[in-house]
Amino acid sequence: SEVKMDAEFRHDSGYEVHHQKLVFFAEDVGSNKGAIIGLMVGGVVIATVIVITLVMLK
């Protein structure tokens, strides 16, 4: 469906630019969400390691 839409709207440069902006925006949001999830998972792992270390030391 993506290729079909591009072919249909190829003549409309305004739509083309708008479409590209939306795609870039979506990719940006997606990568940011991935980074946030990565940080959260990393934080949880680090917290777990710290807790285990503290328990081991006791």
Swiss-Prot record:
Record membrane topology: Single-pass type I membrane protein
Side Extracellular, residues: 1-33
Record-listed Zn(2+) binding positions: H11, Y15, H18, H19
Coiled-coil positions: none
The record's account of how the chain is modified after translation: Proteolytically processed under normal cellular conditions. Cleavage either by alpha-secretase, beta-secretase or theta-secretase leads to generation and extracellular release of soluble APP peptides, S-APP-alpha and S-APP-beta, and the retention of corresponding membrane-anchored C-terminal fragments, C80, C83 and C99. Subsequent processing of C80 and C83 by gamma-secretase yields P3 peptides. This is the major secretory pathway and is non-amyloidogenic.
Binding site for Cu(2+): H11, Y15, H18, H19
Keyword Signal set for record: no
Gene Ontology CC annotations of this record: cell surface; clathrin-coated pit; early endosome; extracellular region; Golgi apparatus; Golgi-associated vesicle; growth cone; membrane raft
A GO molecular function held by the record: metal ion binding
UniProt KW Disulfide bond keyword: no
Oligomeric and partner information: Binds, via its C-terminus, to the PID domain of several cytoplasmic proteins, including APBB family members, the APBA family, MAPK8IP1, SHC1 and NUMB and DAB1. Binding to DAB1 inhibits its serine phosphorylation. Interacts (via NPXY motif) with DAB2 (via PID domain); the interaction is impaired by tyrosine phosphorylation of the NPXY motif. Also interacts with GPCR-like protein BPP, APPBP1, IB1, KNS2 (via its TPR domains), APPBP2 (via BaSS) and DDB1. In vitro, it binds MAPT via the MT-binding domains. Associates with microtubules in the presence of ATP and in a kinesin-dependent manner.
Function: Functions as a cell surface receptor and performs physiological functions on the surface of neurons relevant to neurite growth, neuronal adhesion and axonogenesis. Interaction between APP molecules on neighboring cells promotes synaptogenesis. Involved in cell mobility and transcription regulation through protein-protein interactions. Can promote transcription activation through binding to APBB1-KAT5 and inhibit Notch signaling through interaction with Numb. Couples to apoptosis-inducing pathways such as those mediated by G(o) and JIP. Inhibits G(o)-alpha ATPase activity.
Protein name: Amyloid-beta precursor protein
Organism encoding this protein: Oryctolagus cuniculus
Top-level taxonomy: Eukaryota, Metazoa, Chordata, Craniata, Vertebrata
Name of the gene encoding the protein in the UniProt record: APP
